[in-house]
């Protein structure tokens, strides 16, 4: 008898019991309905089912824990928590949430009343806020309404604390806790009662920002609250929007996550994508540093940490990454050793003893270049040259472009440095590269470098014109700026901000010279 019981225990212990999600929708015609899921703030179809005789069911074992929703015809839907349990609801439209009753689900016996309560309190506060908006802040009526609003808010906080304290083992508790703010203690004071650190509250808040979020629980990613907190933490309210600052906090945060988790996937993916789209000059460094650390550098297992990215995507993400990192603000780019218009003299920009150096890449056949290059010459003659600002321009001069390049320089009387891979240099270097570039580290007496001969790749030049502004140490301080922005910036940097501007902002030119590849 004992052996038979043991056999049955072993047999049934190997069976995975799937969770059933059952919904009864009263007075609803047979139709197709969808289960929806979150990944951050984005909604996706999780499953599709057929509502027949008012009932539809889904296999819960196919779903990740978190917030799910049932999408009805007419884009009506209601949300609920799924956490590896059977669920059975009954409801009726059009107010599916308001009419919802729960036959089975421990999580939602807590969650559904909570969101109904939050909805009602939010409505009350909205009405009181509208009444208060038209009143004098010193009036008794204004103060009375403020008291009512505060009382409602206190009631919400008390409700949340009750869930957090009495249902700690449930996912609903973790979701509610994630939505609450960290409590900040009073700032320390000295013997005289004066605050020791005026930044204490801000520093404490940032340091403890994630205290109410269980970063080990992937279910919290399947919820817009986590995304909103991530977005706020890396925004201007929590840190200076400087590439080095953001990168530092991004590394600290992501390195502290389980590298095989959805929490890691979402956080790394969002930070990388978000700062890759940033319009703030210099923030591309965050994007590139994130790529370098989490996508393009293998871990100890010899694999990319970005386990969610398909193999076919890595080439695009990681192509030319090392060069791109040398083109970020604060970095010193590769020197360029090229020929001048005589096709005899080698020139480079590291040797320029200038306070600022403008690297300017252009093409004599480029329509925008035909407008911007003469403007740059005007600035050089009338402002920059006398202020020890040099321009090192690199033009396209291979094949027929060599003659066009020289003709444009001559006709527009360009007096700044004009360099290029000339047609002869291109041909000779292609036939006998050993005469021009080092074949091994430390090899002496070679006039140029592989980076110079491949300058388009080195400087990521796939459209022209393109500008880099370097300081006296030849470090990049600005890039992809227009002629008017260049003039304004250099006037300001050298204390001439009150000088009349030769070139006012040109929206078309600005857009062309600022666009990302």
Give the ranges of each region predicted by the language model.
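N-terminal "domain-start" segment that seeds a small globular fold
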Residues: 307-349, 441-445, 488-491, 495-496, ...
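Bacterial Sec-dependent N-terminal signal peptides
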Residues: 1-24, 479, 497, 516-517
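Structural micro-motif
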Residues: 65, 176, 414-417, 459-468
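Structural microenvironment flanking redox-active thiols in thiol-disulfide oxidoreductases
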Residues: 371-412, 420-433, 451-454
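Thiol/disulfide oxidoreductase modules built on the thioredoxin-like
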Residues: 428-492
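A short beta-strand-turn-helix
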Residues: 337-357, 381, 456
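A non-transmembrane, solvent-exposed segment enriched in polar/low-complexity residues
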Residues: 19-168, 175-179, 183-212, 216
């Amino acid at each position: 008898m004992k052996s038979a019981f043991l056999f049955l225990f072993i047999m049934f212990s190997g069976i995975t019991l799937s969770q059933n999600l059952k919904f009864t929708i009263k007075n609803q015609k047979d139709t197709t309905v969808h289960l929806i899921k979150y990944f951050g703030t984005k909604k996706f179809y999780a499953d599709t089912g057929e509502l027949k005789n008012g009932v539809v069911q889904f296999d819960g074992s196919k779903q990740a824990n978190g917030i799910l929703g049932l999408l009805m015809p007419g884009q009506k839907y209601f949300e609920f928590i799924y956490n590896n349990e059977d669920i059975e609801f009954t409801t009726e439209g059009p107010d599916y949430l308001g009419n919802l009753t729960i036959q089975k689900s421990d999580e939602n016996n807590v969650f559904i009343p909570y969101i109904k309560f939050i909805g009602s309190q939010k409505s009350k506060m909205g009405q009181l806020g509208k009444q208060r908006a038209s009143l004098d802040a010193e009036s008794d009526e204004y103060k009375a309404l403020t008291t009512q609003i505060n009382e409602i808010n206190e009631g919400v906080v008390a409700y949340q604390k009750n869930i957090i304290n009495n249902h700690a083992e449930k996912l609903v508790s973790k979701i509610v806790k994630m939505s609450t703010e960290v409590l900040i203690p009073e700032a320390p004071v000295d013997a005289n009662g004066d605050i020791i650190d005026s930044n204490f509250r801000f520093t404490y808040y940032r340091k403890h920002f994630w205290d109410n979020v269980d970063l080990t629980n992937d279910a919290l990613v399947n919820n817009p609250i986590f995304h909103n907190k991530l977005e706020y933490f890396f925004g201007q309210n929590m840190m200076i929007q400087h590439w080095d600052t953001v990168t530092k906090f991004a590394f600290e945060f992501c390195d502290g996550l389980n590298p095989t988790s959805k929490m890691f996937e979402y956080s790394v993916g969002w930070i990388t994508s978000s700062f890759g789209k940033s319009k703030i000059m210099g923030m591309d460094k965050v994007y590139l540093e994130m790529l370098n650390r989490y996508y393009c550098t293998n871990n100890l297992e010899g694999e990319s940490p970005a386990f969610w990215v398909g193999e076919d995507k890595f080439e695009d993400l990681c192509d030319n990454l090392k060069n791109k990192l040398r083109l970020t603000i604060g970095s010193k780019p590769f020197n360029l050793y090229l020929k001048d218009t005589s096709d005899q003299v080698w020139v480079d920009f590291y040797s320029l003893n200038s306070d600022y150096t403008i690297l300017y890449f252009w093409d004599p056949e480029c329509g925008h270049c035909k407008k911007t290059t003469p403007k740059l010459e005007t600035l050089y003659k009338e402002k920059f040259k006398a202020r020890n600002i040099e321009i090192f321009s690199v033009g396209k001069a291979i094949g027929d472009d060599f003659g066009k390049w020289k003709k444009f320089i001559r006709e527009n009387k360009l007096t700044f440095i004009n360099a290029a891979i000339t047609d002869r240099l291109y041909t000779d270097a292609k036939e006998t590269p050993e005469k021009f570039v080092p074949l091994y580290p430390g090899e002496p007496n070679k006039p140029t470098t592989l980076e110079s001969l491949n300058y388009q790749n080195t400087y990521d030049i796939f459209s022209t014109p393109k500008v880099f502004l370097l300081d006296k140490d030849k470090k990049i301080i600005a890039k992809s700026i227009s002629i008017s922005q260049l003039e304004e910036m250099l006037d300001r940097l050298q204390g001439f901000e009150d000088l009349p501007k030769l070139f006012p902002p040109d929206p078309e030119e600005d857009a062309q010279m600022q666009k990302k590849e």
